[in-house]
Amino acid sequence: METNQNISAMPRIGDKAPSFKAVTTQGDINFPEDYAGKWKILFSHPADFTPVCTSEFMTFANRQAEFEALNCQLVGLSVDGLYSHIAWLRTIKEKINYKGMKNVEVTFPLIEDITMNVANMYGMMQPGESTTKAVRAVFFIDPNDIIRTII
């Protein structure tokens, strides 16, 4: 399978987290600078409106207060556009009931990455995988912006 897609290597544990500016469902961010002094969990999902991604987001949102108590900021990412994200998050809040969770409001930022710049910067676009969806990845970034764990 041939592709002309430029694919970047995933940063490694111990590397400084790559910095970027992005539009999110909570406004513009400068990552990781806007969350200085906090732990950060940057996680990607392949697509809005899919069952597994929906259950993951509902679970993260349902437990957000626990992350905040640990001085940790959640930040989601996919290569879907902002309007798709907004519609999906509205659907989650208004229509989805999952394992007793309903009326779940996702208030952490969800990054619009239609250019795939952030996904490429973090190595979320993989050879042999979809050229229009980021693979699932989770980055745990410490308060000094160093990547400590990658899942």
Feature annotation, model-predicted:
Residues M1-I151:
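Chalcogenol-based redox active-site neighborhoods
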